[in-house]
């Protein structure tokens, strides 16, 4: 029997895939069953679902179970401090959208599918405690009955997220080398309630961004007409979560920097005090496995900052790539090693691109030269679709292009865009004959 620790979206999807390969699965989760109405916290966490995640859900045969919970976002709606707005489309094809989805609803839907499959045994309120690698067993605490149960690691797959206890256990036993790099910024979740009759108070087909240089606010739509907003801010310094330490400074800060958003936040002060500052950082580990006994997968192996909307998508892609290794019926240790060797260069690439995207979201999106390069990028894709696809589009809308390839081609394309826009202020200034020569010389067909 395969043991999976962590029944969030990644662990649930992995269990479904492996069950369909004929394996029996024991799925352990610290939290209560998400199908229980009491299990949902008062906070609403939104995730971005893009092409890679959708492809994985379709491979697993569960996309139709998730689709009703999805809200499409066609692009970014930039909110300037003077209350002006500007829409920046993500792509130029009807299918090039990103979906906002409630983490709780997504997890609930996946658990409902898993619960119906014979051979998947769900154990909620069961927390991983420790591993004994000499006896190839793990100790898991049954929180309802306050007792320890021992389960075999034959193998144990850890999908227990960025704070993975299994990763720390493997690291403590020097079976892997793991690190956590903390970003100087943190985040705080806030809310924008629905308007009268449940109407959306802002456009519901966009990701709303208030870029302000060293900090920003974003908001994603919810199915009930509300928005989940997230404030990203340095943890310490003159403008920071540390400095926003009383009702007056909080209100003044939001009213000054995000006036149109502040007017839509009647519960700002209560939420600001009640909600903790969240951790932002990058997790790295090498290797991801210990022999044939245990393997990390998803955020447990490679958590990233959330600024490319790829955390969950990357984890879901992990699941189908590991499933492809399992399909070969290799011994577990060999399957783990092959999966890690092929996957890690791609997860390293998206982790780096996610960090770069933070700078883009909070600073560059409001910059005229950046906006020109974005417009040119889409125009070059229209003219030369076999060779030029914007990096953002490669990551978000092309699951067939590995992250590493997107990163490498993206670097070349960035040089081309910089070269072509030097001295230009509009698309009419661009020499497209020269653009074609550069693209043909520097980019192979995709």
Model-derived segments and spans:
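N-terminal Rossmann-like dinucleotide/flavin-binding domain of flavoprotein oxidoreductases
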Residues: 55-59, 106-121
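Conserved mid-domain beta->alpha element of the FAD-binding
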Residues: 7-20, 190, 276-366, 402
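Conserved FAD-binding catalytic core of PHBH/FMO-like flavoproteins
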Residues: 112, 117, 126-130, 135-290
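Helix-loop-beta segment of a Rossmann-like dinucleotide-binding subdomain
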Residues: 84-101, 232-236
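C-terminal helical "tail/cap" subdomain of flavin- and related membrane-associated enzymes
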Residues: 324-446
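Glycine-rich FAD cofactor-binding loop and adjacent beta-loop-alpha segment at the N-terminus
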Residues: 2-3, 7-75, 79, 94, ...
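Acidic/histidine metal-binding catalytic segments
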Residues: 68-72, 121, 256-273, 331-338, ...
């Amino acid at each position: 029997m395969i043991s999976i620790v962590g029944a969030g979206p990644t662990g649930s999807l992995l269990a479904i895939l492996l069950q369909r390969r004929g394996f029996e699965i024991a799925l352990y989760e610290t939290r209560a069953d998400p199908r229980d109405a009491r299990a949902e916290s008062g906070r609403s966490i939104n995730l971005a679902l893009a092409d890679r995640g959708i492809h994985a859900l379709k491979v697993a045969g569960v996309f139709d179970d998730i689709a009703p919970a999805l809200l499409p976002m066609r692009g970014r709606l930039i909110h300037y401090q003077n209350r002006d707005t500007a829409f920046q489309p993500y792509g130029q094809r009807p299918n090039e959208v990103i979906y906002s989805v409630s983490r709780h609803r997504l997890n609930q839907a996946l658990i409902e599918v898993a619960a119906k499959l014979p051979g998947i045994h769900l154990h909620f309120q069961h927390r991983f405690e420790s591993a004994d690698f000499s006896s190839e067993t793990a100790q898991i605490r049954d929180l309802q009955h306050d007792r320890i149960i021992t389960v075999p690691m034959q193998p144990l797959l850890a999908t227990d997220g960025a704070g993975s206890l299994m990763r720390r256990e493997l690291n403590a036993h020097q079976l892997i080398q793991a690190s956590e790099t903390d970003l100087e910024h943190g985040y705080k979740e806030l809310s924008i309630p629905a308007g009268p009759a449940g109407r959306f108070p802002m456009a519901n087909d966009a990701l709303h961004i208030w870029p302000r240089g060293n900090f920003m606010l974003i908001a994603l739509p919810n199915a009930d007409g509300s928005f989940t907003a997230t404030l990203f801010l340095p943890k310490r310094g003159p403008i920071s979560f540390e400095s926003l330490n009383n009702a007056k400074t909080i209100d003044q800060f939001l009213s000054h920097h995000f006036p149109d958003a502040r007017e839509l936040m009647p519960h700002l002060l209560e939420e600001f005090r009640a909600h903790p500052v969240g951790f932002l950082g990058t997790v790295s580990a090498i290797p991801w496995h210990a022999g044939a006994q245990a393997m990390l997968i998803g955020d447990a192996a490679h958590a990233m900052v959330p600024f490319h909307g790829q955390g969950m998508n990357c984890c879901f892609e992990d699941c189908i790539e590991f499933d492809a290794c399992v399909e070969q019926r290799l011994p577990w240790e060999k399957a783990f090693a092959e999966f890690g060797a092929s996957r890690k260069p791609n997860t390293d690439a998206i982790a780096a691109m996610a960090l770069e995207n933070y700078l883009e979201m909070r600073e560059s999106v409001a910059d005229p030269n950046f906006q020109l390069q974005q417009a040119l990028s889409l125009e070059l894709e229209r003219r030369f679709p076999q060779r030029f696809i914007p990096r953002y589009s490669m990551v978000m809308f092309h699951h067939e292009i590995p992250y590493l390839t997107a990163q490498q081609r993206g670097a070349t394309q960035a040089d081309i865009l910089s070269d072509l826009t030097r001295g230009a202020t509009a698309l009419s200034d661009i020499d497209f004959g020269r653009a074609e020569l550069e693209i043909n010389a520097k980019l192979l067909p995709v």
